[in-house]
Amino acid sequence: ESYGLELQTNWKPNDEYAFGFGYTRTESYDGTTCDNPDSTAGPGSAACNDEMNVRVPRHQVNLIGTKIFSNNLSQTLKLKYVGERRDYGNINNGFEDVILSNYVVVDLVTNYKLFDTYNLNISAKNILDARYSDAYEYKAPGRAINFMLKKNY
């Protein structure tokens, strides 16, 4: 069972700038884990320390700002905040649920159109080198730079 609110807006005040904002608020209840009478989990137990579905944050925020230098060149800064979320434990902690910490990731993307046929994309992902986990004991990648050349037909 889950319900929530999602807001998304985009604003382009002029030909040089574009902005985006997104917010998600989620409430959910994982009855398969927290209501299972055969499990050690249950409301208030250490094995079910939060009743949210696993890996679903209550709050998530996305901010995007783009500077458009010309018809061929733009640069975008992306910021993503993900709130705390519940995850399953494993043998290392007696299979008790855990709470994954909130985190902020910042990406920088540059797009350049070449000859109206190619699009060069250079992405600097996680530029602040945030250390976080999307799943218990599985660390997310650190800072990375990606290059992509795409041909448009």
Question: How does the language model describe each region?
Answer:
Residues E1-N90, T117-N119, L128, M148:
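Gram-negative outer-membrane beta-barrel transporters
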Residues S2, R58, Y103-V104, G142:
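Membrane-spanning beta-strands of outer-membrane beta-barrel proteins
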Residues C48-V54, F95-I99, D134-Y136:
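Outer-membrane beta-barrel domain signature
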Residues Y81-N92, V105-Y153:
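C-terminal beta-signal and adjacent terminal beta-strands/loops
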Residues K12-N14, I68, S101, K113, ...:
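Surface-exposed coil/turn segments at beta-strand junctions on protein surfaces, enriched
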